[in-house]
Amino acid sequence: MDILNLEQGFGAAECCSQAMAAARQAWFDSYYAASVLRLPYTIVRKLVRGVFAEYGASGELLRAIPERAALELALIGGESYLKPVFDGEWHWRVIPRSGILVFARDHAGEPTDVGLAEMRQEGRHFYTLLERRQVQNGLLTVSNRLFRSLSENELGREVPLSACAAFAGLPERFTYSKSLGGVGLVRLATPMTNCIDGSGEGVSVFAPAMELMRVLEENEAQLETEFRNGMSRLVVSRDMLRGGQLKDELFVALDESPENVGITVFSPELRQKSFIERQQAYLRLVENVIGLKRGLLGEVEAAPRTATEITSSEGEFLTTLLELRRCFETAAERALALVAALGGPAERADISWGDNII
């Protein structure tokens, strides 16, 4: 029987609610949407730059972590995952929340049963490896299954792992002899409380502002239409126009005396509002909704500020650069501990943030 989707292939369903699944899809869609404002992209990029402005790390394992990609994907989808890979040397694969199925979590929100998929093409066939990671009695068991189809949009039929050279050396099932403290992945999650369904799953940094950003996008689209209409019209006396020679989408003729009309550019008040000024105002609105430190996104200042000044304790705000840095430090420490548990070198997380100018 042909298998159509990942949940059918794994024989399990994600443990998140429908509201959470829909919200997560909306976060990624809004981030990658080619809209005028690109507010989600702006928010994430400003935060990532602020967090890692003068980031420094010692040790090969720590420096190998793609820190910006990991945090960026966590800010978009609420959480991302680091998977250690050893191919002669240790490196890390960053997995977005949209690239992993979570079938079960513990009381702290940490996954205890997940599914990963990897696709390869050989000739006209598409091979999809389904990797399931389950914690049972404190030990991690990894199961591998391979599917082959003629379309990348479905899994197709199950085949032996040896059918694809890229996966031929993998075991069908393997259980680690000692605990890895989880599913063998490092979870990097945003520090905000889940505002979608109250569960332990991480939420996007801009999740509380999704409706506001939708309204702002609609408002900007309307202003852009009015701007184009206003910019493209010249009011002139009708006797100055020669029929059939000028486009009436540019000129508007009035039946008044030429001395009273002349040539007048239609310039509504909205043209006096620059796009940059509106965008800064929008970012300040978003700041207030998602609880960012005031001025972190939308304030234009003449004097530079240090990271310490931006993340000072004044004001009651939920998310600051310091909180995001603590989240990354925790994930980095867990990443090093995971490599050591897998038999790799033991390193200490030595991270420097500097006192950078933002």
State the predicted function of each range:
Residues 1-101, 107-109:
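Extended, helix-rich architectural segments
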Residues 81-195:
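Extended, regular secondary-structure scaffolds
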Residues 164-312, 352-358:
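Extended, charged amphipathic alpha-helical segments
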Residues 280-284, 326-329, 333:
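Non-catalytic, well-ordered alpha-helical scaffold segments
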Residues 314-327:
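Glycine-rich and small/hydrophobic secondary-structure elements
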Residues 330, 343-358:
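Extended amphipathic alpha-helical segments with heptad-repeat/coiled-coil character used for oligomerization
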Residues 333-339:
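A preference for well-ordered globular domain cores
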